């Protein structure tokens, strides 16, 4: 499988979550759904600015929106970030193993001196 295709979801998710406001929106939506206007007010930004953030999160599948009358409601999207969590865990384990090996080397050096 092509690397670009294989990691497309990861790229979109990590790019979407690279912004503090967008991470804050996801954290807020974990607790409760909210309208775009409510989110804009909560994060002290314009409606237009918040719509742009929501669009990025929506393209990544992290947020879903639905028009309810004149209000656009936001909720967590269909993606559960399992692929992202698995990728992070794989690298966390690799770094743990490397640090454990380094600890062993340092302990050997300490014992020798």
Question: Which residue ranges define each predicted feature?
Answer:
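Amphipathic alpha-helical dimerization/coiled-coil segments
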Residues: 1-9, 27, 82-113
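A cross-family signal for key residues in well-ordered alpha-helices
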Residues: 15, 27, 58, 64, ...
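Residues in the helix-turn-helix
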Residues: 49, 56
């Amino acid at each position: 499988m092509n690397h670009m295709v294989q990691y497309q979801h990861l790229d979109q998710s990590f790019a979407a979550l690279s912004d503090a406001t967008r991470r804050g929106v996801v954290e807020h939506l974990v607790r409760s759904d909210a309208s775009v206007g409510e989110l804009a007010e909560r994060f002290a930004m314009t409606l237009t600015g918040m719509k742009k953030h929501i669009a990025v999160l929506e393209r990544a599948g992290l947020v879903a929106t639905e028009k309810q009358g004149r209000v656009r409601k936001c909720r967590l999207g269909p993606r559960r970030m399992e692929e992202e969590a698995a990728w992070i865990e794989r690298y966390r384990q690799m770094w743990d193993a490397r640090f454990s090996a380094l600890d062993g080397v340092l302990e050997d050096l300490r014992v020798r001196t």
